[in-house]
Regions:
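Conserved acidic donor-binding segment of nucleotide-sugar-dependent glycosyltransferases
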Residues: 330-342, 349-355
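Nucleotide-activated donor-binding/catalytic signature segment of Leloir-type glycosyltransferases, i.e.
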Residues: 261-278
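Short alpha-helical donor nucleotide-sugar binding micro-motif in glycosyltransferases
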Residues: 277-278, 286-290
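Membrane-proximal helix-turn-helix segments that form the acceptor-binding/catalytic region
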Residues: 93, 134, 146-166
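Short hydrophobic beta-strand element within catalytic cores of glycosyltransferases
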Residues: 316-319
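Carbohydrate-associated surface elements
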Residues: 172, 192
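Short His-centered aromatic/hydrophobic patch
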Residues: 104-110, 130
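N-terminal strand-loop element at the rim of the active site
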Residues: 7-14, 27-83, 321
Length: 391
């Protein structure tokens, strides 16, 4: 079986979707009778796409954001899988035509591309993976509301109506897709995550951050954007520091349009450390150095990697009670789910005061995540859809 895992965004961008593409292609290609390759648009396309994307979000484009991981590192992680880049849509159509099935993200960009520029009838069956939330719950900003309007509109339904099926990751997205696309094959399978393997990486990696072992170390990691709750993070820091500044230190890993605000907070507070982007190979060691991980995402996640990564190192997590996070965190077991900013602050103080959850977090997350089972389910769905489409 030949599978193309397609994403317009190049793998060097090193986001969650790109990480999924690499891991999934590598695992599937290691199985007998399966060849899964990553296919993206080329560097020139990504530069233009990145500029337009930044313009849409009213921010300056930073070229470095599409080159966070080297091609050499990517190809090493891919194993037997290949990485193909296409310069134009004619070249892309030809490349995708060599496969039996295409797996693509559900972004409206890809839906428009397949419907208007390539043509669903000119390529093998396409499955959309909902790695972008189909609908943000509690959306409060202009862009999140516009996203919800677009993705639940007749326009998106028309652009995606020729897909062979949907792979959803969260329960919320599965329900939304089933309402909008009645009768379509929809499966919910969590993104594969190897908790044991991730913890092993921490033993081999050098710590990318320096910590004060006498302090309670709080880690935050992600893109510095409104969606990820940077404004809430900064407010939480201010409130916790009012009473616990001498006991805690904050380590913020990531970059984005709100990097300046984080840098300003680091200048204001001696216990706030802004580390910028940390490469994926080094992040396990950053989690291992922390006492608590916090996620301030606001509108829901399809698949929150960071809480699982933290848990795999035995680190508890505090997040808001939103979709994605509340499917990973069992409140009071491997972390706490806050229903308000006040609760979030109190949970952090509770941990900083020396309190601990009474469970084995590492053991718990290993039970909740089974990478082999997830890959098996995903491949079975691919096979079922291919058999159905060929009848």
């Amino acid at each position: 079986m030949r599978i193309a895992i397609f994403n317009t965004v190049q793998l060097e961008t090193a986001g969650g979707m790109e990480h999924f593409c690499i891991q999934t292609a590598a695992h599937l290609s290691s199985l007998p009778g399966v060849q899964a390759d990553c296919v993206t648009m080329d560097d020139a396309f990504n530069l233009r796409y990145g500029q337009l994307h930044s313009l849409y979000f009213l921010r300056l484009f930073d070229r470095s954001t599409i080159y966070r991981e080297s091609r050499e590192s990517i190809e090493s992680r891919l194993g037997q899988a290949r990485y193909l880049k296409c310069a134009n849509f004619r070249e892309l159509t030809q490349a995708l035509g060599r496969y039996e099935l295409i797996y693509s993200r559900n972004e409206i960009t890809e839906a428009f591309l397949f419907h208007n520029l390539i043509g669903y009838d000119r390529v093998p069956p396409v499955i959309f993976g909902c790695h972008c939330p189909h609908r943000y719950i509690g959306a409060s900003t202009l862009h999140s509301r516009l996203h919800n309007l677009l993705y639940t509109s007749p326009l998106y339904t028309r652009l995606a109506k020729r897909v062979a099926g949907f792979h959803t990751i969260s329960g919320g997205d599965r329900a939304a897709i089933e309402r909008q696309f009645p009768g379509y094959p929809v499966v919910q399978i969590p993104n594969p995550f190897d908790a044991i393997g991730y913890a092993d990486q921490a033993k081999r990696a050098e710590a990318p951050i320096t910590v004060d072992r006498a302090k309670f170390k709080i880690l935050w990691a992600g893109r510095l954007t409104r969606q990820k709750g940077v404004a809430q993070l900064l407010e939480i820091i201010e409130r916790v520091n009012e009473s616990h500044a001498d006991r805690v230190e904050w380590h913020i890993c990531g970059e984005g349009e709100l990097s300046r605000l984080v840098s300003e907070a680091a200048r204001r507070h001696l216990n706030v450390h802004a580390h910028g982007h940390i490469n994926r190979e080094a992040m396990p060691a950053a989690y291992a150095a922390a006492d608590l991980f916090i996620s301030t995402s606001q509108w829901g996640e399809t698949y929150a990697y960071t809480p699982r990564e933290a848990n795999s190192l035995g680190v508890p997590v505090v997040s808001y009670d939103i979709s994605g996070c509340n499917e990973i965190i069992d409140d009071g077991v491997n972390g706490r789910l806050a229903k308000s900013d006040d609760e979030f602050v109190e949970y952090i103080k509770w941990f900083a005061d020396g309190n601990r959850l009474g469970s084995d977090i590492t053991k718990h997350i290993r039970k909740k995540t089974d990478a082999t089972s997830a890959y098996r389910q995903l491949l079975r769905f691919f096979q079922d859809r291919l058999e159905s489409e060929s009848r």
